[in-house]
């Protein structure tokens, strides 16, 4: 059995960082994974034979910003998926990685909705363009809390199927509207879920994506494309963006 040592020390021994201080900074930013799972703290003890990865530094308040920025770059030649000048709805906003990217890409306003409290990064709370709606499940959000109906929606939720999240989102959106939502197969797979919640089977990934695409289409939205997220989720699961619009 492999020995276990502190992750910050192991990162330096592997040559991934020059110092433990650098390693600790990267861990705090959520940029280090061990066996495909994001490392939570520098003192965490890891097997010496673990597969370690350190993502490049990013300028966002969370890894979510990396995901959405890459997705928007993928669709950079499709004006439907350009948030510039649009009223956006960020479902599952959390720290605000998606919201931050939307603002950077020119969004006029962002309604950041999350079931938690106090998660939105302080730098975003100060932005006049952001309306933070905390402690609110999107399924029971009163439309009156939105001064304008959104025409650009992004979704990053966990522990719930998109089949439960999207119908209320569709009801809130104006027409035309545009959607980028993260499909997380581990929350769509049901009994097909992989070991310890990690879904590795590409066939299960494909089935989950196909099911969500069919669901979105059945609600009158046109699916443009499904593309893999540029990075995995924090638990090591593969994720996929579904892009769709309603006109």
Predicted regions and their residues:
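Conserved S-adenosyl-L-methionine
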Residues: 101-109
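Short, glycine-/aromatic-enriched active-site segment of Class I SAM-dependent methyltransferases
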Residues: 185-201
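Conserved class I S-adenosyl-L-methionine
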Residues: 83-94
């Amino acid at each position: 059995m492999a020995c276990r040592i502190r992750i910050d020390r192991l990162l330096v021994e592997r040559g991934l960082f020059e110092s433990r201080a650098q390693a600790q900074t990267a861990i705090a930013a959520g940029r280090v994974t061990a066996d495909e799972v994001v490392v939570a703290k520098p003192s965490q003890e890891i097997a010496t034979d673990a597969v370690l990865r350190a993502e490049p530094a990013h300028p966002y308040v969370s890894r979510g910003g990396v995901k959405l920025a890459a997705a928007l770059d993928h669709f950079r030649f499709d004006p439907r998926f350009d948030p510039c000048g649009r009223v956006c709805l960020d479902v599952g906003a959390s720290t605000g990685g998606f919201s931050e990217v939307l603002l950077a890409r020119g969004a006029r306003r962002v309604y950041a909705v999350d079931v938690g409290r106090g998660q939105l990064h302080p730098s975003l709370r100060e932005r006049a363009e952001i309306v933070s709606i905390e402690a609110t499940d999107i399924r029971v959000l009163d439309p009156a809390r939105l001064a304008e109906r959104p025409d650009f929606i992004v979704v990053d939720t966990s522990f719930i199927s998109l089949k439960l999240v999207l119908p209320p989102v569709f009801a809130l959106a104006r027409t035309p509207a545009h959607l980028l939502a993260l499909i997380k197969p581990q929350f769509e797979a049901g009994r097909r879920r992989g070991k310890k919640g990690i879904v590795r089977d590409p066939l299960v990934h494909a089935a989950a994506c196909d099911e969500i695409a069919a669901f979105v289409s059945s609600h009158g939205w046109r699916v443009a494309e499904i593309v893999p997220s540029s990075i995995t989720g924090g638990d090591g699961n593969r994720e996929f963006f579904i892009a769709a619009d309603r006109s």
